[in-house]
Each structure stands twice: as structure tokens, then as C-alpha cells.
Amino acid sequence: MLRIYAPASSANISVGFDTLGAAISPIDGSLLGDVVQIESISSGFELESAGYFVRKLPKEPQKNIVYQAYVLFSEQLKLRGANVKPLRLTLEKNMPIGSGLGSSACSIVAALVALNQFHNEPFSKMELLEMMGELEGRISGSIHYDNVAPCYLGGVQFMVQSLGNICQKLPFFDNWYWVLAYPGIEVSTAEARAILPKSYTRQNVIAHGRHLGGFVHACHTHQENLAAIMMKDVIAEPYRESLLPNFAEVKQATRDLGALATGISGSGPTIFSIAPDLQTAIKLSSYLESHYLQNNEGFVHVCKVDNEGTREIK
């Protein structure tokens, strides 16, 4: 039996729409992510689901992304002249769906890594990553890697998608704390993408290029202040903030409390605030818990970048 944990991820990081993503884990050691357990059975295939957010999963197993991951893995294995072993997959759904924390990516990545390990790793990391992107595309409507790549590989990943590479790890600031606040409401990725304009002004395109280039340069040259200043979003945030509760007011308040940057995690509704130290992170956590959460489903976690990514757990 294998148990594979895939951590939450925060895509875009304000400045890198569809090109940046970070794997995130709470500093208290709790698991903010999905777990897939895989074990041998005598014949066939079985899928079971458990966990706090299991009630949010599709009722029909064929619509479950873990089932689709199993089917895709089986198809790819057959192309290599091999068959999938009889097995049972159990998804422990610990992540809210439509949260902006890479919930679908967690399930996809954990399932494919579990299947690959269970079959003695017939596929390379790059081949698995391509499968992950394909499955993510089925949910959001377009193939993108800014959740699956950091979730799988850990750290902050920059999507290059050239010269045979899907992504490359970006040096980052280990002393930064990420305060993640999920308000307890759902925003579908497809809905959040549909709200974006089909074209942008030249001014916004130039600003976006300047911010992204400046951010990547600052990461490589260890300039924290410059990196934080460059974390501006002219592509998605101006259009998506209407989907989030009191976003403009909350963003300003977090800045007043000492946040280096605040933005939308993925397509929302989770937001992130970057804190330079633990004391500021605790202040931000307290404020967001009081002013951003909308119901009992919501939560706030003080986190750091998870450099390990998807891994086997006991």
C-alpha cells in the first residue's frame, strides 16, 4: 500500500498569469492538500473517496478526476505494451473544490504519482507532467501547468514550455510567510476565466511584461523588496475581484498591517498575503479570519513555500 500526498498550490502569484505557481504548506505541519492511497486487489479496479470535502465530489465515479487519471494512465501504459494492475484507489479529499488552491491539481497529481510508483515508474517526470496538464485542461477548458507543476515538483515554478521543458524552478525567498484565506465560497475556474477580456491594451501588456520580468530578475538576484513591488496583476485581478467578498478593502487593510503583497490565489476566492516575518503573518491571519471568511467552511493558514512537492507519507 502507498499513500501519496500532493500539497496545495497558489497559481499566478499576481504577476505571472498562467506562468507562475507555488506549492504551499502550513507551518503547523497540517496537510493542506489531497492524499491518494493505492493498494492491490484480486481483480479489476475500485475507487473510493473519503475526507472532509468528499461531499463536494461528483456523485458519478466517471466524473471524478481521479477516475479519469486512472483511465488516462491505463491508456498510456497500454501504448507501451503493458496493462494496469488490479488496484484500489482511495481519494482523501482534504481540499475545497473551486478554492483557488489547486484542488483539482492535488487530486490529479497524487493519483498519477501513486499509479506511477505502484507500477515501478514507467513514465518520466516530464511524461507525467504532460498527463497532469491534459487532465487539468479537461476541468478548466485549457491546458495549463501553473498548479500541477508546483504541486508535483515543489517550490515556485516558472512555466517556460520550450526546449523540452515545461517549467523551471525559480529561486525564492524562504523567509516569506504566505497567509492563505479561503472565505468558504466557491469560484469555478471556468467561470473565472470566462470573466476575463479577450484582448488587452498595449499599456497593460507593457506593464505586465515589466512586472513579470522585474519579478523574475528580483528572485534571481535576491531582491525581496523589488520582487514584492513587482507583484502586481493587470491581467486578471481587475476583473476577478468582483467575484470575491470586499477584496479591495481587505487588500488595503492587509497592506496597512504590513503585508508585502496581497493578491488572488489562482482564480480565487482564496487570497494570499505575503508577510516578511511571523509576527506580521499572525496579525494578517487574525484580520483575515475576522474580515474575509464568509462561513464555517472558510479557513486561514499561515504557510511557507513547500519545496518538497508531492511525496509518499505514512
Curated annotation (Swiss-Prot):
Pathway recorded for this protein: Amino-acid biosynthesis; L-threonine biosynthesis; L-threonine from L-aspartate: step 4/5
SUPFAM superfamilies: GHMP Kinase, C-terminal domain, Ribosomal protein S5 domain 2-like
Primary residence: cytoplasm
InterPro entries (alphabetical): GHMP_kinase_C_dom (IPR013750), GHMP_kinase_C_sf (IPR036554), GHMP_kinase_N_dom (IPR006204), GHMP_knse_ATP-bd_CS (IPR006203), Homoserine_kinase (IPR000870), Ribosomal_Su5_D2-typ_SF (IPR020568), Ribsml_uS5_D2-typ_fold_subgr (IPR014721)
Keyword check for Isomerase: no
Function: Catalyzes the ATP-dependent phosphorylation of L-homoserine to L-homoserine phosphate.
Subcellular location: Cytoplasm
Pfam family, one: GHMP_kinases_C
Record gene name: thrB
Keyword Transferase: yes
GO BP annotations listed: threonine biosynthetic process
Identification of the protein by name: Homoserine kinase
Organism name: Haemophilus influenzae (strain 86-028NP)
Family: Belongs to the GHMP kinase family. Homoserine kinase subfamily.
Alphabetized UniProt keyword annotations: Amino-acid biosynthesis, ATP-binding, Cytoplasm, Kinase, Nucleotide-binding, Threonine biosynthesis, Transferase
PROSITE patterns: GHMP_KINASES_ATP
